[in-house]
Amino acid sequence: MEPLTHPLLDEATVSQLRATLLADETSWQDGRKTAGYQAAEVKNNLQLDRNSKTAKENSQLVIKQLESDPLVKSFALPRHIHGVMFSRSGIGQGYGMHVDNAYMSSGRSDLSFTLFLNEPESYEGGALCIQTLQDSKQVKLPAGQVIIYPSTSLHAVETVTAGERLVCVGWIQSYISSNEDRTILFGLNAGARALLAEHGRSPELDLIFQAYTNLLRRLGS
């Protein structure tokens, strides 16, 4: 399954969110506290205490945006968005190659997401590297854009060499646990919606939407 990159937050919302996070100087802590035993060995960043007021309020903002975005809903089929946290990495910090835990206290991880909160030119290094079968995909998106990718992927964050990287990360438990099945459903839904927009409703299109809905019902968990 190919990752989805998509604008999620507008400029004003990102600016306000960034200012709020950085103003809370007392709630940032060692990121290894939230890592699994294997990932903790390669994790070197700061994360906002999930129990802080700042984290709780702004996590809900991000979750609501993800839950209400039509493309995200079609791509991820989210049942539960969980584990949302805010992370910052300064010079010399990063996160070595690892895979996310399959199950967390907050839910199953089918898809992982990273929402970028500052512009790529404001820091050097810090790219999200997602390992594929043949190579590695490096990602640094504009502020407000999100990447959603399978949690089964090995991935890392390059060491920051200048400036500071600020992101929001989290996980999605999907109604469809299989990446392959989710890809098929996404393509079927996208094609049906495009036909609806171009030609309007028809008995034939009703059959396609019926097939999509019943496949979702059959494959879903």
Curated annotation (Swiss-Prot):
Keywords: Dioxygenase, Iron, Metal-binding, Oxidoreductase, Vitamin C. SMART domains: P4Hc. Coiled coil: none annotated. Fe cation binds at residues 98, 100, 155. Pfam families: 2OG-FeII_Oxy_3. PANTHER family: PKHD-TYPE HYDROXYLASE YBIX. 2-oxoglutarate binds at residue 165. GO terms for biological process: DNA damage response; intracellular iron ion homeostasis. It is an enzyme of class 1 (oxidoreductase). Its cofactor is Fe(2+); L-ascorbate. It comes from Prochlorococcus marinus (strain MIT 9313). Binds 1 Fe(2+) ion per subunit. This is PKHD-type hydroxylase PMT_0286. InterPro entries: Oxoglu/Fe-dep_dioxygenase_dom, PKHD_hydroxylase, Pro_4_hyd_alph, Pro_4_hyd_alph_FE2OG_OXY. GO terms for molecular function: 2-oxoglutarate-dependent dioxygenase activity; iron ion binding; L-ascorbic acid binding. Residues 80-174 form the Fe2OG dioxygenase domain.
